[in-house]
Amino acid sequence: MTDQIPVVVAGALGRMGAEVIKAVHTAGDCQLVGAIDTCPGREGEDVGLALGLGELEVALTQDFEGALCLASQQHPGAVLVDFTHPKVVYEHTRAAIAYGVTPVIGTTGLAPEQLQELASFAAKASMGGAVIPNFSVGMVLLQQAAAAAARFYDHAELVELHHNRKADAPSGTCIKTAELMEELGKQFNAQEVEEHETLEGSRGGLRPSGLRLHSIRLPGLVAHQEVQFGGAGERYVLRHDTFDRAAYMPGVLLTVRKVRQLGALVYGLERLL
């Protein structure tokens, strides 16, 4: 198909990257044109064979900028899907914009000032892009419900649970949820007693709004989040569980299909729904 969307995947051998490659491979309107991963000893290997998908005629490379340069030259309108590491995601996003490859960033860990800088850089390049902390439609619905409930409850805490290989804490999804709840401009969790932590950090991370965020890391988990609200005589709990990374693929493909139509760098899947 001549109208397929060219896709480069960074973090191709990671858990999310592998799922993205499978999804792109089976999507009739997408074409995998690049696969980047820093795993030692895999350079030049066919990514399809590496993932048990059969030969895809796309060789693994560790050369991030080289892959972007090649995609921009041979596949105009290419999209980068990045699931790598918080330490490199800023540079990856900036490089994609510089090469004219539209970024779809699933890697979390970007600081607010970094997001602002990237948005400005994209605007100067007249490009769009998307930074998506969570590609689950169910999680977007939870976030919207949490923002609505925050109007009526003055006490709330957030708990996020992930696998023990996740590098950043709290998760970008949890931070995004808190930000949506804070758009009301209210303060949460007014102290009724003077608290004393006998173990530092026991009460979680404290945001200026008074919201507390708690992070749990355990093997066997994928991605889970709760928002707990408390009122006189009641507790209201919102929870979302992801048991398999396949749950994210509809959101990933939706973003890949829409991102080139954007005129700016956007943050959050809700901006595309």
UniProtKB/Swiss-Prot annotation:
Keyword Amino-acid biosynthesis: yes
Keyword annotations: Amino-acid biosynthesis, Cytoplasm, Diaminopimelate biosynthesis, Lysine biosynthesis, NAD, NADP, Oxidoreductase
Residues engaged in binding NAD(+): 11-16, 106-108
Keyword DNA repair: no
GO MF annotations in UniProt: 4-hydroxy-tetrahydrodipicolinate reductase; NAD binding; NADP binding; oxidoreductase activity, acting on CH or CH2 groups, NAD or NADP as acceptor
UniProt-listed InterPro entries: DapB_C (IPR022663), DapB_N (IPR000846), DapB_N_CS (IPR022664), DHDPR_bac (IPR023940), NAD(P)-bd_dom_sf (IPR036291)
Primary residence: cytoplasm
Active-site residues annotated for this sequence: 162 (proton donor/acceptor), 166 (proton donor)
Domain of life: Bacteria
Catalytic reaction(s) noted: (S)-2,3,4,5-tetrahydrodipicolinate + NAD(+) + H2O = (2S,4S)-4-hydroxy-2,3,4,5-tetrahydrodipicolinate + NADH + H(+); (S)-2,3,4,5-tetrahydrodipicolinate + NADP(+) + H2O = (2S,4S)-4-hydroxy-2,3,4,5-tetrahydrodipicolinate + NADPH + H(+)
Pathway: Amino-acid biosynthesis; L-lysine biosynthesis via DAP pathway; (S)-tetrahydrodipicolinate from L-aspartate: step 4/4
CDD domains from the UniProt entry: DHDPR_N (cd02274)
Gene Ontology biological process terms from the UniProt entry: diaminopimelate biosynthetic process; lysine biosynthetic process via diaminopimelate
Protein's cellular compartments: Cytoplasm
Listed EC numbers: 1.17.1.8
Free-text function comment from the UniProt entry: Catalyzes the conversion of 4-hydroxy-tetrahydrodipicolinate (HTPA) to tetrahydrodipicolinate.
Protein name: 4-hydroxy-tetrahydrodipicolinate reductase
Gene: dapB
